[in-house]
């Protein structure tokens, strides 16, 4: 399994024959890639945690070009249908639900403490034969992260640290502890001035409370698990 970061909250998780694109704001200021680069990579699924612009990004354009289905809350899939995505090309779900993609890959939708234009904000757990990834979406710290860790045995947690709109480094370090994740990648920071953070501060805080290994990625980097 490998995880590529495009900056902000945008990732591609590749495992087996699946290429799972998450929150594809590929035109974000930190991204070294273009939407066309991502189209050329042929994602098999597009997963959206909520419908704010910095998470929806170019999802609709990428879906139209690749025919990859969009996975999100029921309300979010209605929203993309209004933008020209056929209903058959959507995979609606809701918090607490599971979608099985085949080859042992399962998607679980988790809660997130945030807002959305339509529907509820969410996170995703991607469980695969090669490991389990948790993308928290935009969220504050919440106690049930401990339950998420107990249920899903997290190998890699992708956590926002930008503060202002999400949890910051202190809270994200506690989230790492609650999740009992083996590895953690900070995201959703330094994209614009309001969410400027030092990832090394986050790393130090994690190391003080957890055995998790922190991977501070640069946009374009790939983490192999």
From Swiss-Prot:
The keyword Secreted does not apply. It comes from the Archaea. One of its GO terms (molecular function) is hydrolase activity. The keyword Iron-sulfur does not apply. It holds the Pfam family Lactamase_B_2. HAMAP family: UPF0173 (MF_00457). This is UPF0173 metal-dependent hydrolase PAE2160. The lineage of its organism: Archaea, Thermoproteota, Thermoprotei, Thermoproteales, Thermoproteaceae.
């Amino acid at each position: 399994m490998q995880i590529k970061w495009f900056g902000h909250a945008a990732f591609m998780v590749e495992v087996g024959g699946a290429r799972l694109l998450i929150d594809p704001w590929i035109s974000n200021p930190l991204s070294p890639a273009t939407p066309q680069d991502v189209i050329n990579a042929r994602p098999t699924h597009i997963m959206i945690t909520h419908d704010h612009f910095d998470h929806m990004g170019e999802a609709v354009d990428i879906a139209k070009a690749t025919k990859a289905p969009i996975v999100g809350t029921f309300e979010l899939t209605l929203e993309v249908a209004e933008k020209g995505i056929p209903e058959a090309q959507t995979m609606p779900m809701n918090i607490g639900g599971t979608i099985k993609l085949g080859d042992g890959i399962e998607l679980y939708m988790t809660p997130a403490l945030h807002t959305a234009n339509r529907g509820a904000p969410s996170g995703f757990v991607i469980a695969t034969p090669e490991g389990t990834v948790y993308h928290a979406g935009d969220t504050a710290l919440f106690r049930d992260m401990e339950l998420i860790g107990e249920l899903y045995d997290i190998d890699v947690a992708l956590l926002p640290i930008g503060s202002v709109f999400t949890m910051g480094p202190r809270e994200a370090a506690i989230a790492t502890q609650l999740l009992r994740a083996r590895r953690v990648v900070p995201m959703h920071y330094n994209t614009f001035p309001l969410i400027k953070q030092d990832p090394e501060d986050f790393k130090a805080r994690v190391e003080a409370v957890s055995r998790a290994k922190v991977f501070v990625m640069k946009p374009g980097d790939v983490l192999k698990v």
